């Protein structure tokens, strides 16, 4: 303990040493000067409105492209800014016409134009913004301390007031405050002038994977407080060894304790005082509250107490501070992370602080929406990637219940992890310590924070070892993690990135590994993704040491932009100017939500596997309910059930009492009646809130499951014929199979079906054919694994016409066409069996040769381009949203009526979309109800779009294309598949889907039927 206190004292002295220098105007290039005259960080609290002068609104603004062009005397009171423009604060330059947005994944925003020369950033293209405004300060503020607060400045700020230099600060994701008492004149208009640099030495520590904007974000204001005031308050909750009774330790520092006393009072959520008040005198006071069996805080039950801290001088109350707090205990025992003694599961997500319109400027409403979306998706934890967030975010996490990994604003990814890493650069030691120390001090009091993170992707070295020791000294009550410490470095939790399912399984089985494994980033959700998410959670739920992880990431980061024709779209790297190389393109779009917080299709799979209630059939009419919650029973939900027979509703009901204790199980009776194996019987279960809860409304479905009740193998209807269809050579180079109401034409030249008309309705678009298909428009994960080139053989393989045979069997006309695949001796065979009503069975075969091994297939099936008039879609399969073989658990079997136009999901970059799996039958009709039904001998996959594969396919390389700017093709493009390769989600730059979800080259057979309606 003594060594810890000594270390803390030395570190704080080191950090304080850089705050008192006079300005040299080289601070923006000096990593050992992170501030001048900046006030020490304090825990977050909100002043009364009467004590605040907002700084938001329009300011005089000057912008220059390079740092050596900046005005140097603009802060003077006699300076004339007539030629200046206007800029609102908060506001970002690039979103207001000053410079262009830049998105970079790993590497600095000057990459490709300037070399990395830390600590000095480039001068060229280092934009500088200068601001001026006169602010009226209330006369009644005279005799009080006046402080200016900048919520978030990117990247650094120089400040003047009334023509005098005040101070300097860097660290773009923590507020900076300066004492203006000596500079302001209450009752008068005061000139506030400041200058912001796009880049400074601190930018080398801010190489996060997001859009790089410049300017001011968050709240900016001037506030006042008494000259005698409380400087800071820190609150540490704890529970006893049995996790029953609680202690709350409160430390407070006072600016001038002479003739003053500090009073502390603790209240529950109903406003009742729960412990004796504490009164103390001194510059540093400690209060302790002992509460018998307090209501504990957890993400499931975020119960908050209110702590009031008041400063008195005699009987006069000088200042009152209010804090929300919660009783909870975080610890690591053995290989387990515990909250309140329970081995919780981290159902987490990474969240960047980004809005498609405001960039770093987020409204309170947007933050509340983000919380609501997380709750809707059963997310219980969030990592503040990769910097501290707006203070309101922590308040919301406390209030609504989210476990938080709070991360410091350090990422130097662009310097690599080797000898050049800034983690080994002694010049940057102080900055590493400063950013971690201020981060912890500012956010210390939030019960939602259960883990501190020292930074992200910034190498490993002495700076992080010192930062770990500093944070441990500041806060012994929480674990600390850092991904680049890997396993053997200073990290309490092993928190890798993008470890595969197999890796986590091996880690769990390794007796030498004793730390809990919680991935700080996993299940990379770029584009059409999240395949294999089930396999992660099958392991997490069953194996020791595995406790979950944080999906990368929450929302696509593209911003609203307009093209030259005024059309709005979601923009990403490469969209903004010619010098924007766009190498990272849409790598900013990895969200389970879209930029406007709409659910991407893969969000539903996350929602499903993150749910807390699970069901299993234990006997006919008996379902066991498992409550995966750790702290709450199920008294807040009711169970609604539906019985389906072959997709049709047969019965339904509600069970109001399904209460199960935390981590408990209970069997309930569901009176759905008798079922047999002559049909497919399914039981749908939905657990719904019986009242409003937080941001979720009454009746919201918090968990759902579908249980198969019968053993039924779906097969297609047999094809029968009362008479043999006719066959004739209708014109040159084609022959026709016909009956009383249909004609089907085949080409003699290549055997392809070129017309299929029944009752005047054409299945095929004019000039099109039914053709074998092995390709899909590559997904972002496909591009990441280079599948678009490795599997390019199957994009448009040349099928060399080999043979055609025709015969009749059982009154069916049988046409068999065989093709050789150019470049191999593999063959494709298409067999058509046609009855007297124009219905047919189709058998597609892939027959491998012996001469060479071919790459995996994206899919095995057929493509049927239909006239665009076919718009209505009905199917019995998995829906309602798109699904794939490795992302289908959240999509329940049922009958779904939709339109073809609804099938296309506008991923930020166009790609494969619209698939449905486990289809029993599929019907496509026009407005008259005329059309066709498709079945197969076993459940199949299909998609129906008004886009061809070619329209959605970028080719061998990605291009800057956008779904909003695509034009529909004049087609209804039907893809029927025996199977399609899965999507994967391990990462989006190298990994394929899991082996069981691939289609290795080999022998395949797809047998399906087409029937006119």
Model feature map: region roles:
Residues 24, 100, 107-121, 170-172, ...:
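An acidic-aromatic loop/edge-strand motif
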Residues 278-293, 647-678:
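Intrinsically disordered, low-complexity Pro/Gly/Ser/Thr-rich segments with frequent PxxP/GP/PP motifs
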Residues 23-149, 200, 204-208, 213-216, ...:
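Extended carbohydrate-recognition surfaces in non-catalytic/accessory domains of CAZymes
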Residues 27-30, 40, 62-64, 92, ...:
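Accessory beta-strand-rich segments of carbohydrate-active enzymes
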Residues 95, 104, 152, 198, ...:
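Beta-strand/loop-rich accessory regions of lumenal/periplasmic or secreted enzymes
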Residues 23-47, 89-92, 201-204, 210, ...:
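Extended substrate-binding grooves/exosites of carbohydrate-active enzymes
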Residues 185-187, 251-331, 676-677, 681-723:
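Extended acidic/polar, glycine-enriched regions
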């Amino acid at each position: 303990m003594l060594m810890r206190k000594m270390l803390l004292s030395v570190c704080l002295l080191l950090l304080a040493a850089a705050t008192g220098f006079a300005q040299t105007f080289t601070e923006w290039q000096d990593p050992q000067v992170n501030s001048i005259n900046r006030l020490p960080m304090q825990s977050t609290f909100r002043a009364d409105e009467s004590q605040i002068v907002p700084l938001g609104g329009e300011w005089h603004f000057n912008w220059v492209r390079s740092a050596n062009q900046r005005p140097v005397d603009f802060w003077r009171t006699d300076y004339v800014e007539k030629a200046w423009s206007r800029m609102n604060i908060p506001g970002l330059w690039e979103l207001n016409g000053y410079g262009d947005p830049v998105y970079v994944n790993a590497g600095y925003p000057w990459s490709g134009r300037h070399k990395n020369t830390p600590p000095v950033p480039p001068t060229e293209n280092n934009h500088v913004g200068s601001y001026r405004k006169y602010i009226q300060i209330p006369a009644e503020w005279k005799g009080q301390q006046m402080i200016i607060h900048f919520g978030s400045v990117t990247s650094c700020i120089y400040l003047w007031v009334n023509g005098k230099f005040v101070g300097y600060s860097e660290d773009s994701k923590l507020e900076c405050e300066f004492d203006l008492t000596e500079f302001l004149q209450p009752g008068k208009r005061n000139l506030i002038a400041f200058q912001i640099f796009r880049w400074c030495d601190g930018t080398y520590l801010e190489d996060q994977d997001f859009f790089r904007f410049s300017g001011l974000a968050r709240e900016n204001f001037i506030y006042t407080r008494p000259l005698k005031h409380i400087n800071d308050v820190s609150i540490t909750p704890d529970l006893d060894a049995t996790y029953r009774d609680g202690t709350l330790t409160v430390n407070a520092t006072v600016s001038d304790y002479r003739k003053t006393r500090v009073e502390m009072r603790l209240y529950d959520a109903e406003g009742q005082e729960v412990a004796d008040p504490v009164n103390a005198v001194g510059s540093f006071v400690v209060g302790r509250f002992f509460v018998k069996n307090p209501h504990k805080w957890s993400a499931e039950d975020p119960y908050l107490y209110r702590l009031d801290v008041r400063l008195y001088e005699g009987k006069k109350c000088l200042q009152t501070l209010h804090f929300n707090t919660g009783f909870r205990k975080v610890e690591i025992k053995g290989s387990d992370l515990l909250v309140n003694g329970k081995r919780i599961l981290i159902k987490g997500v990474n969240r960047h602080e980004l809005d498609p319109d405001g960039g770093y400027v987020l409204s309170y409403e947007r933050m509340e929406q983000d919380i609501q979306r997380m709750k809707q998706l059963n997310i219980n934890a969030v990592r503040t990637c990769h910097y501290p967030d707006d203070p309101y975010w922590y308040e919301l996490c406390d209030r609504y219940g989210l476990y938080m990994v709070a991360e410091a604003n350090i990422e130097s990814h662009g310097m690599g992890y080797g000898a050049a890493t800034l983690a080994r650069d002694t010049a940057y030691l102080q900055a590493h310590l400063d950013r971690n120390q201020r981060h912890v001090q500012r956010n210390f009091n939030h019960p939602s924070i259960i883990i501190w993170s020292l930074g992200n992707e910034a190498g490993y070295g002495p700076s992080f070892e010192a930062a770990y020791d500093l944070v441990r000294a500041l806060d012994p009550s929480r674990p600390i993690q850092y991904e680049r410490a890997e396993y053997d470095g200073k990290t309490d939790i092993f928190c890798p990135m993008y470890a595969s399912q197999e890796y986590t399984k091996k880690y769990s089985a390794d007796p030498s590994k004793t730390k809990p494994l919680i991935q700080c980033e996993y299940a990379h959700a770029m584009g059409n993704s999240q395949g294999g998410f089930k396999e992660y959670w099958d392991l997490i739920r069953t194996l020791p040491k595995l406790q979950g992880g944080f999906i990368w990431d929450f929302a696509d980061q593209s911003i609203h932009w307009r093209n030259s024709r005024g059309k709005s779209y979601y923009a990403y790297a490469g969209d903004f100017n010619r010098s924007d190389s766009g190498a990272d393109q849409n790598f900013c779009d990895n969200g389970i939500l879209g930029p406007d917080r709409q659910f991407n299709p893969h969000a539903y799979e996350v929602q499903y596997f993150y749910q807390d209630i699970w069901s299993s059939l234990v006997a006919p009419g008996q379902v066991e309910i498992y409550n995966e919650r750790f702290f709450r029973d199920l008294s807040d939900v009711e169970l609604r059930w539906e019985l389906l027979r072959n997709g049709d509703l047969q019965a339904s009901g509600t069970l109001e009492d399904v209460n199960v204790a935390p981590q408990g199980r209970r069997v309930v009776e569901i009176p759905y009646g008798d079922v047999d194996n002559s049909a497919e019987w399914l039981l749908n279960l939905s657990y719904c809130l019986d009242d409003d809860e937080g941001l979720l409304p009454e009746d919201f479905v918090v968990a759902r499951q579908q249980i198969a009740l019968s053993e039924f193998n779906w097969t297609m209807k047999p094809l029968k014929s009362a008479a043999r269809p006719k066959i004739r050579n209708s014109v040159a180079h084609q022959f026709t199979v016909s009956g009383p109401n249909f004609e089907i034409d085949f080409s003699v030249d290549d055997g392809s079906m070129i017309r299929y008309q029944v009752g005047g309705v054409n299945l095929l678009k004019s000039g099109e054919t039914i053709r074998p298909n092995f390709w899909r428009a590559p997904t972002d994960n496909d591009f990441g694994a280079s599948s678009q080139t490795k599997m390019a053989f199957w994009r448009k393989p040349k099928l060399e016409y080999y043979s055609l045979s025709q015969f009749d069997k059982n009154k069916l006309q049988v046409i068999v066409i065989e093709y050789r695949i150019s470049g191999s001796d593999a063959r494709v065979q298409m067999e058509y069996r046609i009855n007297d009503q124009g219905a047919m069975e189709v058998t597609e075969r892939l027959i491998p040769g012996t001469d060479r091994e071919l790459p995996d297939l994206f899919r095995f099936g057929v493509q049927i381009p239909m006239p665009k008039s076919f718009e209505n879609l009905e199917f019995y399969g998995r829906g309602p949203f798109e699904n794939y073989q490795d992302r289908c658990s959240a999509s329940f079997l049922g009958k779904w009526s939709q339109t073809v136009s609804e099938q296309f999901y506008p991923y930020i970059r166009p790609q494969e979309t619209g698939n449905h799996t486990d289809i029993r039958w599929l019907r496509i009709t026009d407005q008259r109800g005329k059309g066709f039904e498709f079945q197969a001998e076993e459940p199949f996959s299909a998609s129906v779009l008004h886009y061809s594969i070619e329209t959605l396919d970028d080719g061998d390389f990605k291009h800057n294309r956008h779904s909003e700017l695509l034009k529909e093709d004049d087609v209804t493009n039907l893809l029927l598949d025996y199977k399609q390769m899965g999507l994967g989600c391990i990462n989006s730059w190298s990994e394929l889907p899991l082996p069981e979800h691939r289609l290795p080259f080999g022998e395949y057979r797809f047998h399906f039927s087409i029937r006119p309606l």
